[in-house]
A protein has these predicted regions:
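Intrinsically disordered, low-complexity, positively charged segments
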Residues: 1-5
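Exposed, interaction-prone extracellular/peripheral surfaces
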Residues: 6-11, 20, 29-42, 46-62, ...
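N-terminal juxtadomain amphipathic helix
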Residues: 13-15
Length: 242
């Protein structure tokens, strides 16, 4: 066991720390690793938009490693999965550390739909690394994530250039998930409409996270990871300084 707490009525007497009782006369309960450091489930959204630019790909990988080292540093058991749409694969810790996970996720293909994540456990910490750039009601994902209790956290890498059009006129647009392209004329009014839709999308995610008592932070892809985590993530108490 790794810790102890005071005995409470109804506790299993088999877990009483009798040696401590002999010394102090106080009933205490042994706490084992799973109780002190609950399992951390980390799921990576492996859809192509997470790796759309080198800057965003680097941020995605840095968040994955940050979550790994944070969990291990806390003495918590950790499990990894990568998901794209309704396809999901486990990732070994060694693969995450070495970077070989990037080869493994190629088999997941591309899918622009909201991921289906059946691996969440009822208790412990659940961490989703995803840019949340897919259609659908956030309730679908957060309902499954929050089922059974525990702590739910979303870390969303965000690329500044995704939030607005920097070009007015004809532009070739490419769906990074499907590879489809089209020519679109961007007018000032259309650019403004896009920006409002983008803001509404993430406002809906934030509102739904609050309803489910989940923590969500958007992590800028630009700059160092330490600086990026000192923004929204620190304000939302998704991470804490130690």
């Amino acid at each position: 066991f790794q810790d102890h707490r005071d005995y409470q009525w109804g506790d299993d007497p088999r877990a009483i720390h009798w040696a401590a009782y002999a010394r102090t006369g106080q009933l205490t309960m042994k706490l084992y690793r799973a109780e002190v450091s609950p399992i951390v489930e980390i799921v990576l959204d492996a859809s192509p938009s997470m790796f759309m630019t080198e800057t965003k790909a680097i941020r995605t990988e840095s968040l994955l490693l940050f979550c790994l080292e944070s969990a291990l540093g806390n003495g918590s058991p950790v499990r990894f999965h990568a998901v794209c749409g309704n396809r999901i694969i486990p990732l070994e810790i060694d693969a995450v550390r070495s970077g070989s996970w990037k080869e493994l996720i190629h088999g997941l293909g591309a899918d622009e739909t909201m991921p289906v994540i059946p691996v969440w456990k009822g208790d412990g910490m659940k961490v989703l690394i995803s840019d949340l750039l897919y259609p659908g009601d956030p309730i679908t994902l957060l309902g499954a994530m929050n089922a059974g209790g525990g702590t739910s956290v979303i870390l969303a890498p965000a690329l500044a250039e995704e939030a607005a059009f920097n070009h007015i006129g004809n532009i070739r647009l490419k769906n990074c998930e499907t590879g489809q392209t089209r020519i679109q004329r961007i007018t000032p009014s259309l650019a403004a409409k896009y920006e409002r839709a983008y803001e509404r999308h993430f406002s809906l995610w934030r509102e739904t996270c609050r309803r489910f008592s989940a923590s969500m932070a958007r992590i800028p892809a630009e700059g160092s990871l330490s600086n990026a985590l000192c923004g929204d993530a620190l304000r939302q108490e998704t991470v804490e300084m130690r």
